[in-house]
Amino acid sequence: MNDTRPLLDRILSPRDLKKLSTKQLQQLADECRKELIELIAMNGGHFASSLGVTELTVALHHVYNTEEDRIVWDVGHQAYIHKMLTGRRSRMQTNRKYGGIAGFPKIHESPHDAFGTGHASTSISAAAGMAAGRDLKGGREKMVAVIGDGSMTGGMAFEAMNHLGDLKSDVLVILNDNQMAISPSTGGLKNHLVDITLNKTYNKARRLLWNSMSLLNHEGAKNALRRLEDGMKAALTPGAFFEALGLRYFGPIDGHDMGRLVRALKEMHELPNPKLLHVVTTKGKGFLPAEENQSGWHAHSGGFDTTTGMTAKKTGAPDPPKYQEIFGEALVEMALKDPAITAITAAMPSGTSLDLFEKAAPDRFYDVGIAEGHAVTFAAGLALEGLKPVCAIYSTFLQRALDQLIHDVALQNLHVVFAIDRAGLVGEDGPTHHGAFDLSFLHAVPGLTIMAPSDAQELRDMLHTALYHIEGPVAIRYPRGSSGGGPLRKDFTRLEPGRGRIIREGTGPVLFAIGSMVQAAVEAAALLEAEGIKPDIVDMRFLKPLDTALIDRLAASATHIVTIEENSILGGLGSAVSDHLASSPKKTPLLKIGLPDRFITHGSMQDLYRETGLDAAGIAEHVKEFYRTPVH
């Protein structure tokens, strides 16, 4: 890391920014930006968003006192500069690493982190709630919500602004408008948030007004024309929309002009009641590769040249395809033959690999923005029209649409396929993004078929089975990252709903595994065999309907039963098997292995599997201890 950061080296806390001049603040922003580029090149992490708000972050800490005032960073992946300036610079190299600082704001990590974030569109609600609490207590601290235009596509943001206008509390909403979320933002609001200088009607009328002013000598007439221009501008800018919600609107202003930012924030600091400052920024600002490919540089794994952005070419065998790629390619393969297949994403086309579908069948691809609830009910509408909607959504974000899944899809038994991406642990993004609960909350939904593939071919077959051989709603959950490779058939095989498969037969304990844990169970079995324990291994494939016939048959002769899942230990496969066997006359000892009943931290997948006991060694140790413990 470069040590020539004369201003940044002097910043031990945000208080050190208070006496800096505008010129010094800009120098500090430049130093922060350079350090961030070096940091991400070394360790990886979220990138382009923090580059885009560097000046804004410095200006906020110059004007506000985050030991008392509250700044809520929506989503939170743009808060790296904030962390540098709030006493965590020396720990930034541990960012997102096991035992290190988190990649998102966390209230237990620093008093300067006002609210824990990770999901989109929550900041205004949190700031409004804190403002209401402040008002009840007679406090004077300031509340600020920093939200991007991508997060503004989420309905929760509008619910909060609608309420905030009614509360009339002193809250500043800063709209960071970079025309992007992770991928380019979607919808009517994006089109509304266009710089007024690009509006042809406004510019034509403005030229006419200024030409008229040049002919006038009367100052009163000139002032009247200026007021007319202001009124016209208000009618054509987003201000009219936000003002209708009860927020005073200011802007848009250049989010990279330090002087304008500081002046505007100082003005906002003194104004009562809710207001919105519209700041226009460039995602990836200051690093040309990120400016030119903002989606591609939203986050990076590191190892790139800090000038060119080039990464060293990998040598050796190529990486196996990711589950996301297998899903996207299989869906396109079927969609090219079936015009009824449609695809829906909530602002994550590239993350889910639905960008492949968008290129192949753009007229049947729908990016609804950060609006998971709408995505699910929209899919329900498509299903009622006889189409085959596939809604690809991260497990952690599906939590936001559970009501719609139950009420609008399952209750009507509509044929919607949910491709649940990032199921299980996701690594460095941590507890806000782990998909730890989907088997549990989906298990209780009547009529919902739930599947989990153990490899790439099973994912292809499950997607085909879901689209063509199952009626009603279907959920397929699969993990982030590598599918493990292996040959893929060109055709698809129908899987019998509610039927598992025995992978290997043994003599003693039976390991019932599902999804990503099937391979882990196979590896654990190899370790157990060295200890003289030879278990049966079952790939359950389906959580619902559960293969009770296979469970009963194996339980009849099993000495011990073990369930293994990359899901909360509560409510998933272990609970389903335990509930089923509860009425069995034979009481076979049962061990449930899964994610413990707590939120799992961030870190590498290897670290997290080791901590939770879901790596092969951990599973083998659990089974060995269970198998050798006398039954009373």
UniProtKB/Swiss-Prot annotation:
GO terms for biological process: 1-deoxy-D-xylulose 5-phosphate biosynthetic process; isopentenyl diphosphate biosynthetic process, methylerythritol 4-phosphate pathway; terpenoid biosynthetic process; thiamine biosynthetic process. Disulfide bonds: none annotated. The keyword Metal-binding applies. Pathway: Metabolic intermediate biosynthesis; 1-deoxy-D-xylulose 5-phosphate biosynthesis; 1-deoxy-D-xylulose 5-phosphate from D-glyceraldehyde 3-phosphate and pyruvate: step 1/1. The keyword Iron-sulfur does not apply. GO terms for cellular component: cytosol. Thiamine diphosphate binds at residues 77, 118-120, 150-151, 178, 287, 372. It catalyses: D-glyceraldehyde 3-phosphate + pyruvate + H(+) = 1-deoxy-D-xylulose 5-phosphate + CO2. NCBIfam families: dxs, PRK05444.2-2. Homodimer. This is 1-deoxy-D-xylulose-5-phosphate synthase. It comes from Chlorobium luteolum (strain DSM 273 / BCRC 81028 / 2530) (Pelodictyon luteolum).
